[in-house]
Amino acid sequence: MKKLLTILFCAICGASIAAEKPGADESAKTPPGKSYTYKQSGGKPRELEIYFPPNHDPAKSKVPGVILFHGGGWSGGTLDQFRAACAYFASRGLVCATVEYRMMNKNDAKLPEGGSNKRVCVTDAKSAIRWFKQHAGELGIDPARIITGGGSAGGHISALATMNPGLNDPADPKDIDTRVVAYLWFNPAFAPADNKDPEIDILTHQKADLPPAIVFFGDQDKWKDGWDKAQAKWESLGTKTIDLQIAPGQTHSFFNKEPWRTVTLIAADKFLVKHGFLTGEPTLKAPATGEKLVPASPK
């Protein structure tokens, strides 16, 4: 009898633990994309993974390209964060890359007084975007239709890589710019302390002509204050291209987990259709649990 009770107790505990784990659609890992080395930095090769549409023929097809940068506080994170997103966008007809970049480190090469270690992240992101454009022919993408974005630190990095004319790697081709035509920003992390180094401060590099941008934030995200300041400045400049979507009750990085991963990807898909980068309807199904984003009212 004692043995039976022990077995039952273990079974109940196991069921409780299983209930706390992510669902199969969340915990299942998306296979890596095709790996390419886009540069050497910090003594290491830097990789990006690319996902291609079904039956994609680079010789015949030049589709928009998407390049996404993972989060992780500028000092961590992995390519896995956006593999599912890249695979989905590829299934919809885009060529999509997720990028590894050099992490900030207090022991990095000498920086000017007040310089932030985040600089190395931005420099690598600029190199990745240039590489993506430079190899547009073999990848089957249109270099004039590149979309970028990222999550948290990756959102910050993608913004500075495309807005700051500085922080270039001397080895990069000088005739290729880092301009893009749209942004997919998943709670981009714009820190107040960035104002100590203008090179990595979003408020230093904002202009009125921001390309269309969709931005996702949980209304309980402590990083939203930094975004609010950036959005207020864009609006003061006359920018009208920002589509801010709020996830009620959610905190930072909510988009990494289901059902919000699917909810944000569907919204990003519709945004890309609206601006002519995709056609048709999203192929993902909205969660049966009914979670929805709320469009933010203009300030």
Protein language model regions, located:
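Alpha/beta-hydrolase active-site loop
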Residues: G114-G137, I266
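N-terminal cap/lid segment of alpha/beta-hydrolase-fold proteins
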Residues: E20-S61
